[in-house]
Amino acid sequence: MEVDSIAPQPQEKIEEIESADLVVAILADLDSESLAAVCNDLQTLEGSPRLAVLQNEKSGAAAHAHAETAEKSTFPFLISRPLLRPDPAGTPALSMFAAYQSVFAAGEKLGARACCVVASKLDNAPPRWICQMAKPMLEKEIDLVLPRYAPHKFEGLMNSSIISPVTRSLYGKRIHNPMGPDLGVSQRLYRKMLGAERNPRLNGIHALASLASAALCANSQVYEVNLGARVYPPTDWANISSLMAQILSPFFLDMERNAVFWQRMRGSVPLPTIGDPVPVPQDTGTLEISRMVEMFQLGNRDLQEIWGLVLPPATLFELRKLSRVPVEEFHMPDELWARIIYDFALAHRLHMITRDHLLKSMTPLYLAWVASYALELEKEKGSGIEQRLERLSAAYESCKSYLVSRWRWPDRFNP
């Protein structure tokens, strides 16, 4: 981030934000009414902290409208600047990671005690939720505040099936959304992220993939805040392989860096939570289950050479049996799925093949888990979703000894 050009605003407006206690970045595409509501809420924070609100500026006509909104705003702390860069290479996850580093750099420039990021639109969000996220860092010196969204059945499944349960198993805290994306970060933690980015020995680190683990490994305090249901962008199932590689590679790298810490952890405990649970929305989404099962069957036929490098014989045998099951009876056991993820994390560490190729080869296995999960939840309500994901997380914990054994003795432990 070019800190000397922190906002394309008139000089008098820049001078008003030479320093701030709290930097809030608006990455979500909020309308003027929603943006005003966020700004109004922030002004009610106890102690009247100095504010800097960075609104993501879009290109073309949208950029002009955003800049005009910021300039005419009655909020002197609202500025408009490009935070999310265009993504011609088709790497949305990496673009998002870079945006957070830019926000943290702005926080460092302004000497902010904390940074918050509003990356999502929310359904039925609690009043003043942005204040609930900011207050713990300003008043209690909490280092990380993460969202707990009201769950959708078929949204955020990469987080629900991999990121969240693996984080819980590794670090012993029941974090529902380790990568946010709506979150609050203390000065101590965002400076740590910036320092890691500048360290050439930590190549590949990304803020969203490492925030939760960095806080937990430092024994910092982490809170969750109950939010409404997140409005997710449509899932691009045609390009899910690329997205998996973009998200899981930095996640697995971070897992490797922290191995000394997480190998000692056993069990898990819940996090302190702010606010009351938000009612679960009606969920009418559907998935093409038959198509997902077909993709798994094709993968089982065509990817045996790669899977054979990663997965032990017992797992390959179970997958071959699963590939012959009719769609209506299709079921992937949670323990099998957890062991598969752990095996791919180990293969990523050992560079068995190019990492991008390795992670993309996971796609048929991921689709198999999604199909199995969708079949179970076709008629479930909100409570069923959370209970189902709790069983999955418990399976990851029960299989952690498998991970530790394979991690320590990858050549000897091959059941």
Which residues does each PLM region occupy?
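Conserved phosphate/pyrophosphate-binding and hydrolysis machinery centered on Walker-type P-loop NTPases
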Residues: 179, 204-205, 389
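Short hydrophobic alpha-helical runs that function as membrane-insertion/retention elements
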Residues: 116, 202-204, 222-226
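A recurrent flexible, glycine/aromatic-enriched loop bordering the glycosyltransferase active site
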Residues: 149-156, 169-184, 201
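Conserved nucleotide-sugar donor-binding catalytic segment
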Residues: 196-202
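Terminal low-complexity segments of carbohydrate-biosynthetic enzymes
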Residues: 1-2, 20, 67-69, 249-415
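Short acidic (Asp/Glu) and glycine-rich catalytic loops that position anionic groups and cofactors
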Residues: 145, 227-231, 317-321
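Structured catalytic core of nucleotide-sugar glycosyltransferases
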Residues: 2-168, 188, 192-195, 209-217, ...
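Catalytic beta-strand/loop signature of glycosyltransferases that borders the donor
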Residues: 177, 219-230
